[in-house]
């Protein structure tokens, strides 16, 4: 039985897993959700940005995800994503999406969700390091350090969004300092 002809889909822009968004995963989900909505003739789509777990992630950090959904909703492709994002924010989408770096450790597969090293490294108790098995300090320390540098560079050209990149640069610097302490 059909529930109703009047169905709305509520997708998500991943900002509820700590201090850092996951626009990369949101992109993957948006592509599949858009296909499913179109195949099932669902005309109304909303994108949510939940503030679970304390709402640490800034709302504007998911602008790439929102632009992806806009492109899919209005054009059904991402051909003009970069141009439209640059017009809307003044930054390239490629630069802006670097805001995800604290969650994108070298050993993590690209298509996983819910893995949030930005949070578990930050909150790891150095006297009781139960999460050490989830990190590889020899890879993760330089990753976080490089991420801090990259985000600091982007901050200089980010205009009104500079605070997002400054916050993430500082977070990555802390994570780089802490990841090998346990």
Predicted segments with their positions:
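Substrate-binding groove of N-acetylhexosamine-processing glycoside hydrolases
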Residues: 1-182
């Amino acid at each position: 039985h059909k529930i109703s002809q009047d169905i709305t889909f509520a997708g998500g822009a991943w900002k509820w897993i700590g201090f850092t968004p996951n626009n990369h995963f949101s992109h993957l989900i948006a592509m599949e959700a858009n296909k499913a909505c179109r195949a099932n003739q669902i005309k109304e789509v909303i994108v949510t940005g939940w503030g679970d777990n304390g709402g640490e992630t800034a709302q504007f950090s998911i602008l790439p995800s929102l632009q992806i959904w806009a492109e899919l909703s209005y054009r059904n492709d991402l051909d003009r994503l970069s141009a439209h994002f640059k017009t809307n924010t003044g930054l390239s989408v490629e630069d802006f999406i670097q805001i995800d770096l604290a969650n994108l450790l070298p050993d993590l597969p690209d298509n996983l969700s819910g893995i949030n090293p930005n949070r578990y490294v930050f909150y790891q108790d150095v006297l009781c390091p139960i999460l050490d098995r989830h990190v590889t300090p020899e890879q993760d320390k330089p990753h976080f350090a490089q991420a801090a540098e990259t985000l600091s560079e982007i901050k200089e050209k980010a205009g009104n969004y500079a605070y997002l990149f400054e916050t993430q640069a500082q977070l990555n610097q802390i994570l780089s300092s802490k990841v090998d302490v346990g």
